[in-house]
Amino acid sequence: MKYVLKLLKYLVLASVTILVAYVGMTTFPEPMFDHRVVYRNYEIWSDQSIPPQISNVLDDVNRRLVRSDLQGENKKFKIFFCNASWRLWLYGQHFSDQVGADADTAVTRNIYVRASDIASNRILPPGGGDLADAAQRPLSYFIAHEAAHIIVARQFGRLVSFRYPEWLMEGYADYVGKGGDFDFDENYRLFRIHSPQMDFQQSGLYRGFHLRVALLLDKQGWTAKQIFEHPPSDNAMNALLTKFATSPKSADSH
């Protein structure tokens, strides 16, 4: 019995040590990235040299972030380009190297981005295939999307992912990230015919979530603060989407 208790004690101690080490590594990842550039409100780190076109990418990120009425003064972010996939797996929040980008919204303002062609403002998709909705989702989209998550977390609490529905968290980040490059009428048409592109489980895209947020912000006149303070239920959102189909404005726009 004493042996078992001693073993359990060592296991608990080892687990705590590993956890503390991991938190330390992810909170202060800079030593694992050799290249650094500072531009405006961004500190950029990478495991490869950073081309000068990063300034164009970040200017476009800031253009997209203007879409957020939650954006305040002095929003500073650290961006880490993980060209080696193991870095994205380790530092991202999902222990996966398949994501486009990820962000730590609870402790830091760190954004982790997969291998990218910075000069061309695009990420390199997992597996080397084509990126869905690539025209609307350049590299600057992914950075702005994750920055939007951080902005929301600073406004409404570090554990927002546990407080709000997925459609709101990802829909708002997609709304901000796309910087206005979203055809509401076309996506609403796809929604009405039950297109797989509007179903996140089928497409992996946030179009359906974005449509909900765009309806509230652009058609119903809500502010982002109002949505996050009083998020509509799924049933309420479905009712609003259905009602919009029969509204005079909707009829005029189709």
Name each model-derived stretch.
Residues 31-150, 154-155, 236-237:
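Juxtacatalytic substrate-recognition/specificity segment
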Residues 124-128, 156, 194-198, 210:
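Flexible glycine/proline-enriched surface loops and loop-helix/loop-strand junctions
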Residues 66-70, 148-157, 174-182, 214-222, ...:
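Sec-exported extracytoplasmic/periplasmic mature domains
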Residues 155, 162-198:
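Post-HExxH zinc-binding segment in Zn-dependent metallohydrolases
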Residues 2-5, 9-27, 199-254:
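Pan-zinc metallopeptidase signature
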Residues 22-25, 29, 153, 157:
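Membrane-water interface at transmembrane helix exits
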Residues 65-81, 158-164, 186-190, 223-231:
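Surface-exposed patches in mature extracellular/periplasmic domains of secreted proteins
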Residues 53-56, 60, 64, 138, ...:
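Extracytoplasmic/secreted proteins, especially bacterial periplasmic and envelope-associated proteins
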